[in-house]
Design a protein with these regions (language model features):
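Positively charged n-region of N-terminal signal peptides that target proteins for export
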Residues: 1-6
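Bacterial N-terminal signal peptides
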Residues: 10-19
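Boundary at the C-terminal end of the N-terminal hydrophobic targeting segment
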Residues: 24-27
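Short active-site neighborhood of thiol/selenol oxidoreductases, capturing the structured segment around
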Residues: 32-44
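Typically the conserved alpha-helix immediately C-terminal to a functionally engaged Cys/Sec
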Residues: 50-64
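Thiol-based oxidoreductase modules, predominantly thioredoxin-like and allied folds used
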Residues: 65-84
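Structural micro-motif
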Residues: 89-107
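Non-catalytic, surface beta->alpha helical segment in thiol-disulfide oxidoreductase systems
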Residues: 101-137
């Protein structure tokens, strides 16, 4: 599973470096731009990340078909941290990383890349999904 995740992040990184906008990949599949980006700040060693469990995957499945881009930034080690920073830069959300250090939470970004919410394992799947869906209409 870790190899698959690393491969996906590597592919996204290569697309970014090759000049292929990440949003255009999403647009080609759905026919529209995302109205919200849900970004999970993750690290394998993070207790809060473990407490969050499969919520992010469940959100992705529950909101399939909605104009939501789900991204996981992995801060487990120097290599994954570097890739996470490159991906954040490509998405235009780098300033939020400085304002929201750490892991174990999900940030929601609107179309202008402004943070519209921060969610942790203290919120239920239903609560986080409702917060995301307020931007989907």
């Amino acid at each position: 599973m870790k190899t698959l995740k690393s491969g996906i992040f590597t592919l996204l990184g290569l697309l970014v470096l090759a000049g292929v906008p990440v949003q255009s990949v999403n647009a080609a599949e759905t026919g529209s731009q995302p109205k919200i980006i849900a970004v999970k700040f993750h690290a394998d060693w993070c207790g809060a990340c473990k407490a969050m469990g499969a919520v992010f995957t469940d959100l992705r499945n529950k909101l399939d078909g909605k104009p939501v881009l789900f991204v996981e930034l992995d801060f487990t080690n120097a290599t994954t941290r570097h890739q996470a920073m490159l991906l954040a830069s490509a998405l235009g959300i780098s300033p939020a990383l400085k304002e929201n250090p750490g892991t174990g939470f999900i940030l929601l970004f609107d179309e202008k890349r402004q943070v519209t919410g921060r969610h942790t394992s203290r919120q239920t799947l239903k609560e986080i999904a409702a917060a995301i869906c307020t931007h989907c209409e």
